[in-house]
């Protein structure tokens, strides 16, 4: 092993909120974190808006956060890229969209637009859907159908009605489109191989099977009566004259307007894989012209990608690998992609000297039922790795403050913070025993605001709050405030390396 171990611990969803009410972090009994904040140099780091390549005022998220941390520069996110493309007009000339329209003309088939209907900006943005409706209008397409996935996580849990109304107004204004199905993201956007959920979403869109309603608004109202809010709205088929408005059929075109890959993959596979094993498709495989807004998975066949990835050279992981350092990435399932794929700038490749450990997330319906998640198992494993003395750098993510924060259950979020505090109480001393340095930070906020300050209802989304950075084991250094892009240069500074020219972030250690 080289001179010292440098460990970055990302407390996912752990923000700083000056307000005490609804603040699960403030309410939690966390003696270790409190002591670290008292005894070691710390500062605040910005995680939202233009600081991470998002539009002003847009909350950060785990994908964006880890990409910025690993890149050591502000990375302009897909959301910003696509919005800019609509504003500049090149969106309407995209070859992939034009080919989808041409496919509809050639086969006299339908165009289906589906994705998350919200302005949360984490997985999608409704303005991109409006851009596609405008595109369809310009292409003179008549049979255009929208399949709405409701959010309730990155926006308030009961806000679907407003998004539906806005969409219906846009459809009237633009003069094209009709809502064919609605459903919660719980079904259409699973990422944990819970294929029984995905099947219900697929069957609604392909077979016209599921709950029925005469309009999207009626579907929402009926669902709320059953106490099933946006995320959990059961796949519902909109009916007209006794039959579904539209179903997806052979040679139809589909544009999936979600830009974040992780929750878009499963439903995409159901539509595009010839030999699909997730569940039995009653109609089997049939060809469709499928456009992914961004690259969901480079191994996917039978899809085209509208906004192809822009490569990031010399991310932190790649750079220290070239320098001959050994690194470990460790997290539980929910955040494993974030400390690997996203941290490496959207690259699947594992670098030389990079090891990865995945600890399974617990199989529970919602994480408020098990707020500790798999933190203890992650901790046991990372302690084992620290004690082996094989690594120069360890990147660890604790998922709890974010995943439990998303449930909106205050007591559970508090318990989640207490669980990770207990874990930090073991991990930090283990690193210090080896004269190592620990950086504790977060990728964005969540658990520090569990209530909506305007309505008093539960708040399940991320926040725009800054996050802490605590530097332990480096003596009494002076730190300045910064943004997530400054973390990789800070770690390189501690490791004694010049940062590569591609990294525009700056070390937060004041010399």
From Swiss-Prot:
This is 2,3-bisphosphoglycerate-independent phosphoglycerate mutase. The keyword Manganese applies. Transmembrane segments: none annotated. Mn(2+) 2 binds at residues 12, 62, 443-444. InterPro entries: Alkaline_phosphatase_core_sf, BPG-indep_PGM_N, Metalloenzyme, PGAM_B_sf, Pgm_bpd_ind. HAMAP family: GpmI. Its EC number is 5.4.2.12. Pathway: Carbohydrate degradation; glycolysis; pyruvate from D-glyceraldehyde 3-phosphate: step 3/5. One of its GO terms (molecular function) is manganese ion binding. Catalyzes the interconversion of 2-phosphoglycerate and 3-phosphoglycerate. The active site is at 62 (phosphoserine intermediate). Keywords: Glycolysis, Isomerase, Manganese, Metal-binding. Its cofactor is Mn(2+).
């Amino acid at each position: 092993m080289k001179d010292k171990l440098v460990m970055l611990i990302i407390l996912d969803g752990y923000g700083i909120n000056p307000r005490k009410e609804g603040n699960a972090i403030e309410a939690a009994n966390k003696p270790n974190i409190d002591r670290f904040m008292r005894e070691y140099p710390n500062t605040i780091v910005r995680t939202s808006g233009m600081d991470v390549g998002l539009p002003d005022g847009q909350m950060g998220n785990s994908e964006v956060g880890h990409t910025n941390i690993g890149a050591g520069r502000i990375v302009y996110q897909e959301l910003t890229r696509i919005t800019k493309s609509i504003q500049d007009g090149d969106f309407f000339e995209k070859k992939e969209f034009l080919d989808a329209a041409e496919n509809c003309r050639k086969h006299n088939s339908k165009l289906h637009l589906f994705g998350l209907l919200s302005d949360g900006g984490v997985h999608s943005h409704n303005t991109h859907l409006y851009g596609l409706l405008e595109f369809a209008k310009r292409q003179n397409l008549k049979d255009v159908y929208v399949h709405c996935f409701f959010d309730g996580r990155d926006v308030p849990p009961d806000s679907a009605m407003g998004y539906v109304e806005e969409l219906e107004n846009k459809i009237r204004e633009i003069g094209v489109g009709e809502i064919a199905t609605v459903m919660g993201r719980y079904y259409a956007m699973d990422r944990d191989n819970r294929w029984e959920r995905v099947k219900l979403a697929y069957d609604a869109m392909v077979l016209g099977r599921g709950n029925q309603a005469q309009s999207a608004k009626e579907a929402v109202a009926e669902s709320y009566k059953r106490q099933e809010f946006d995320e959990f709205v059961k796949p519902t088929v909109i009916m007209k004259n006794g039959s579904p408005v539209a179903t997806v059929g052979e040679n139809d075109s589909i544009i999936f307007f979600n830009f974040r890959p992780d929750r878009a993959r499963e439903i995409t596979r159901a539509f595009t894989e010839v030999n699909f094993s997730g569940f039995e498709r009653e109609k089997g495989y049939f060809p469709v012209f499928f456009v992914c807004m961004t690259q969901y998975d480079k191994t996917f066949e039978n899809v085209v990608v509208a906004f192809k990835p822009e490569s990031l050279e010399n991310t932190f992981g790649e750079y220290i690998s070239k320098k001959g350092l050994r690194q470990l990435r460790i997290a539980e399932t929910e955040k494993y992609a974030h400390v690997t794929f996203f941290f490496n700038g959207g690259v699947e490749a594992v670098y030389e000297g990079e090891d990865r450990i995945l600890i399974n997330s617990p199989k529970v319906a919602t994480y408020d039922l098990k707020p500790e998640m798999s933190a203890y198992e992650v901790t046991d494993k990372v302690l084992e790795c620290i004690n082996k003395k094989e690594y120069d750098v360890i990147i660890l993510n604790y998922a709890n403050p974010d995943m439990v924060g998303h449930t909106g259950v205050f007591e559970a979020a508090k318990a989640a913070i207490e669980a990770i505090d207990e874990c930090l109480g073991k991990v930090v001393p283990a690193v210090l025993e080896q004269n190592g340095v620990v950086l504790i930070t977060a990728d964005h906020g969540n658990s520090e605001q569990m209530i909506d300050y305007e309505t008093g209802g539960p708040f399940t989304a991320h926040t725009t709050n800054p996050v802490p950075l605590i530097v332990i084991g480096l003596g009494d250094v002076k730190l300045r405030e910064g943004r997530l892009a400054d973390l990789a240069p800070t770690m390189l500074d501690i490791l004694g390396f010049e940062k590569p020219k591609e990294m525009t972030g700056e070390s937060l250690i004041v010399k």
